[in-house]
A protein has these predicted regions:
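Hydrophobic face of amphipathic alpha-helices that form TPR/SEL1-like repeat modules
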Residues: 709, 743-744
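ER/secretory pathway lumenal C-terminal domains and tails of membrane proteins involved
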Residues: 1-9, 17, 22-327, 333-407, ...
Length: 799
């Protein structure tokens, strides 16, 4: 009593916060515990924790069950929860033993907190829009009016508890009403109008985040539901849950915040020592020692916004990006303990009996804490969070859009190659003639309609709204698909002179024809996804009037096997009506050298994270592909200039190439172009080979490949022999290694050593007639000096 105003402002903030993130609802359990401890006495915190677990687990289990089935099941679960609550209420009233009475009291509090969560999440956030969708908008208005009426009645009748509850609900609804701005904005049909929530049905789909799909926690127990990457990495559901969902997707992120981070891993010495973690643990201990009740409340906040989120999200492997932001509430809770730990440390020092010592020591400790915690962490993390000079998103979007011809249609894959492009078009007004088509969204009816209706419109053929609304994957077997050729009027015009390269008579231009395999499988039945159907539909309806492109980031799985009909023209692949060369060298060179922006990519002072480094590989790939094409065309000087430009604009010191084969290919291109090193200096190829050989855990097949390059390309037989001898010592019974070592000895005119290897092999496999014949052949070809050397080695061996 006396603090009602704070509860009401909390209710209003909860309503507002729903519009920012649903994570805020989990603070309800923290608030409930704070109120509970103000009202009731608890004899044992540990019994309380057990009772809360029982109460929340029962309520949560019933909630999860209700979400998996029909609405009637939700009603059944609600009734069950009500019966349990009523039973515990009767137990609370009639129990004689203090422990039993307290148990009932604790569980009732957990039920009450869970009920508050469900009322807000299911009753208000989801219930009001569903009511408008299923019954009508008038029903929602009536429900809100009734809510206000009951509130006024409760206030007038001085039913204080009921009035407080009803006012809190009213304020939550008022805060939640800010969502209306989204629907008002959507009704204006802006160019970016995701989910199109201007009808009650679409509003419900938007609020329930239907476009993201759903995953049940039980999915981790069914390996058939796992992505291939996860199925190969984890041996069981428990292994997957602990090592990926708990350790990788929560503990690792927690360690980043309070211990230290290096790339994607944990660095225990980023902050010199993990001071935030140590002080936080100290604060946790102090909090439980001095105020168990509030410590339990903070612990509830910590767990509900941390490990409980892990259970609820049930994230699959891999994720498209790091998800540390999902657990920010948990990190906030631990930060409270850091503050408590720092305050407790200062308090203990200030209470030293020697006042002459305690005062200066308190100031010194405060200064050290200030240095060790916020300042130290700021200094350690500042560079990684400093975005000054980082133009990657802007330039990457600019370069993709500028890769497209006038009025192009561009298929993109995910967020990184879609949202920056939309920003450039809507804010910077760049290349608004290009229509960006996100393949993930292309599976949704609302997005298909927007592509058809919003300028620049896309011709999707004669498809009705009803057909779009009911569109879904279709059964599909591997079969040929035909797309109509460009019309004669287009082929004879100067709009796309590149079509003349195919050499067909405009009147006899053949259709585009290729085999399309199913892109989705359920059991033995194959399907085409909606996005695949729409790609084919757009191709056919467009009739080549507008150039069509795939962004270079689109995976082969989404290209429907059209690679032979695509030509790379920068950061995009253009689709042609007939098979073409994989690279349009002229357009590629023009875009890479004259159009694209690469601001600050060669500035070592600018921080680029791992995601950006992977993204920049698309630039490097474009340069390398162009260099290969120029080498095949016989223009070695231009090829070398292309590689030099790549090294200058996108230096490997800042953006290292992760793929060893491509890293090595650059060296081979330099060598083929005539860059073979100055006298006494290693060539680019030799430098790269040495780097690869010095990497940890190089597998033997790669070493074989490097030995082959030393021998066949560089003619460095001693180096090749050194690598192969080491491999042969490790794997003496490997025929590939022994055979290649013999071959290199032969090419190096060291037949005595070749015979020595064959002797060792025949000692292991005496029935290998091929090896025996080869040994005899080499013996017959030996020079007298080699024969003498071989005989002396044989005598030493026999001794």
């Amino acid at each position: 009593p006396g603090h009602e105003r704070y509860l009401l402002i909390i209710a209003y903030i909860v309503g507002l916060a729903i519009g920012v993130h649903l994570l805020n609802l989990l603070a309800i359990f923290f608030i409930a515990l704070i109120i509970y401890f103000k009202q009731k006495k608890v004899s044992s915190v540990w019994w309380l924790i057990l009772d809360i677990i029982i109460g929340v687990a029962v309520a949560g289990l019933l909630f999860l069950i209700s979400m998996q089935f029909r609405v009637s099941t939700f009603i059944q679960a609600t009734i069950t929860l009500g019966i349990l609550a009523l039973g515990y209420y009767q137990l609370y009233r009639k129990a004689r033993k203090p422990r039993l009475k307290e148990h009932a009291q604790n569980v009732l509090m957990a039920f009450a907190a869970s009920a508050a969560f469900l009322i807000i999440y299911v009753g208000i956030m989801k219930g009001l829009p569903i009511l408008a969708d299923k019954v009508g908008l008038w029903a929602t208005v009536l429900a809100i009016v009734l809510l206000f009426a009951v509130t006024i009645w409760a206030i007038s009748k001085k039913r204080n508890i009921l009035a407080l509850i009803m006012m809190a609900l009213v304020l939550i609804v008022v805060g939640y009403s800010t969502y209306v701005t989204i629907f008002i904005r959507s009704a204006q049909d802006p160019n970016i109008d995701e989910n199109d929530p201007e009808t009650t049905h679409q509003a419900v789909a938007y609020l329930e985040r239907e476009q993201y799909g759903q995953r049940s926690f039980t999915d981790i127990f069914n390996r058939a539901q796992w992505k291939p990457e996860a199925a190969h990495k984890y041996s069981s559901a428990l292994d997957y849950f602990w090592n990926y969902q708990i350790k990788h997707m929560y503990i690792r992120y927690f360690n980043w915040q309070f211990i230290g981070r290096k790339g994607s891993d944990v660095d225990f010495f980023q902050f010199i020592l993990p001071f935030p973690f140590i002080i936080g643990l100290f604060g946790l201990f102090v909090h439980f020692n001095e105020d168990k009740h509030k410590a339990v409340a903070v612990l509830a906040l910590f767990l509900f916004t941390g490990l409980m989120i892990v259970l609820y999200l049930n994230q699959d492997d891999p994720q498209p990006r790091e998800r540390d932001y999902s657990y920010v509430g948990s990190f906030f809770a631990f930060s409270i303990w850091i503050g408590i730990g720092a305050a407790a440390l200062l308090e203990r020092i200030s209470q030293l009996k020697n006042k002459k010592l305690s005062r200066p020591l308190t100031y010194i400790t405060a200064g050290l804490l200030l240095l060790a915690l916020p300042i130290n962490v700021l200094v350690a993390n500042y560079h990684e969070h400093d975005r000054s000079g980082n133009y990657v998103a802007s330039d990457y979007a600019y370069n993709i859009l500028q890769s497209c011809g006038p009025n192009g249609i561009l298929f993109t894959n995910g967020d990184n190659d879609t949202f920056p492009l939309w920003y450039m078009q809507e804010v910077e007004h760049l290349r608004r003639d290009v229509k960006v088509v996100n393949l993930s969204l292309l599976n949704t009816p609302w997005y298909i309609k927007q592509l058809r209706n919003i300028e620049p419109k896309i011709n999707i053929g004669n498809i009705s709204d009803a057909t779009i609304d009911n569109i879904g994957p279709i059964p599909w077997k591997k079969q040929k698909v035909r797309i109509s050729p460009p019309p004669e009027s287009l082929l004879t015009s100067d709009k796309y002179p590149e079509f003349r390269q195919f050499g067909y008579n405009p009147k006899e231009f053949p259709p585009m024809e290729w085999e399309v395999e199913p892109t989705l499988k359920y059991g033995n039945q194959g399907y085409l996804r909606v996005q695949d159907i729409m790609i084919l539909q757009i191709l056919e309806a467009n009739r080549w009037e507008r150039p069509l492109y795939f962004a270079s980031t689109v995976s082969p799985d989404n290209k429907l096997g059209m690679e032979d009909f695509m030509s790379m023209e920068g950061l995009v692949f253009r689709i042609y009506p007939q098979k073409v060369k994989r690279i349009d060298a002229d357009k590629m060179r023009h875009n890479l050298f004259n159009v694209f922006r690469y601001r600050n990519l060669n500035n070592p002072k600018v921080y680029y994270d791992d995601n950006i480094k992977r993204l920049m590989f698309n630039y490097q790939t474009a340069f390398i592909q162009l260099a290969i094409e120029e080498l095949y065309s016989g223009n070695k000087e231009r090829m070398l200039a292309t590689l030099d430009t790549m090294k200058y604009l996108i230096p490997e010191e800042i953006f290292p190439i992760e793929y060893d084969d491509i890293y090595l290919q650059i060296g081979l291109l330099y060598y083929d172009g005539g860059r073979r090193g100055e006298p006494g200096q290693p060539s680019e190829l030799e430098k790269r080979l040495e780097t690869l050989l010095n990497k940890p855990n190089v597998n033997y097949r790669n070493k074989l490949k490097y030995a082959s390059i030393y021998a066949q390309v560089l003619g460095d037989y001693p180096k090749a022999i050194q690598i192969l001898e080491e491999l042969n010592a490790q794997k003496p019974n490997d025929p590939e290694i022994s055979g290649y070592l013999v071959k290199v000895y032969e090419e190096a005119q060291q037949l005595d050593k070749a015979v020595r290897v064959l002797d060792n092999w025949l000692a292991l496999y005496p029935n290998d007639s091929g090896a025996a014949e080869m040994r005899n052949l080499y013996l017959s070809k030996m020079t007298p000096a080699q024969k003498a050397q071989y005989d002396s080695l044989t005598k030493v061996y026999h001794r």
